[in-house]
Amino acid sequence: MFRRALMCCIAFVVALCPGVMARTWELPPDVKTLPVNGYEMAYLERGTGVPVVLVHGTVSDYRWWAAQMEPFGERSRTIAVSLRHFYPERWNGEGEDASVRQHANDLAAFITGLQAGPVHVVGHSRGGDVVLLMASAHPELLRSVVLMDPAPLEALLPQTPQATAEAEKRRSFVSAALERLQQGDIEGGLERFIDGVSVPGAWQKMPDPQKQTMRDNAWSIKSLLTDAKEPFTCAEAGNITVPVLLVTGENSPRPYGVMMEALAPCLQQHEKVTIPNAAHAMNRANPQAFNAAVLEFLAKH
């Protein structure tokens, strides 16, 4: 009887707050949430001090930063977020509110909600684009920015035949991956996507725990076709007033290098670092070198 009364009270409160989406998924141990723009944004936290917010890319979530949480947490309040519709939510791809712009707005609201003053923020791949858009609109929320191989935004790329060909190649394999997902072939869709952003055979060589993380977030591929056309300009990048570190892997695919070469002249202040013996997943492939480089940068700011 008490349980039924309690559930009725909860339903009544939710009905009075239609702008807040009730969470229907379970949270893993140690994972917290913070309400942002009507969504419960999940995050994992370690350490104390000035916050460092870590933002994952496509087919990933807060677990992407496993090799950073403890080393970073020894020096700062380290917070790895899961963006809207990423694990631990079990999203089925329905809806249109998982764009890079929505995620940038959510990230700004999340940082504001921490009520901890300006933060350092680190973004990988598409997460780098999320950070880039957020930092341009809200530099006052930040101490510094780290961008790891941000995904190519077509509006920033040079208008050359090579850049056009690379953009078309990316659209092609993303479209093929999405088509397989829509056919119910999750494994095939992920294989097509991962081999496209990395090298042929990359999916088959990946350890199963990493594959499972990507299975949990497979439908995040859906937004990539529209994300690439986000009308972000060089002038907007120039709004970022805090120091920026651009990070790439020694063996990162060329499109990421083209993106950073186009972005760098737009920034008011930036540094660059290349992580040896690593490609696009540089924080996982060579965590020791990555952690040392990023922590050194953060310590200066």
Placement of each model-derived feature along the sequence:
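Active-site loop/oxyanion-hole signature of alpha/beta-hydrolase fold enzymes
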Residues: 70, 79-122, 126, 292
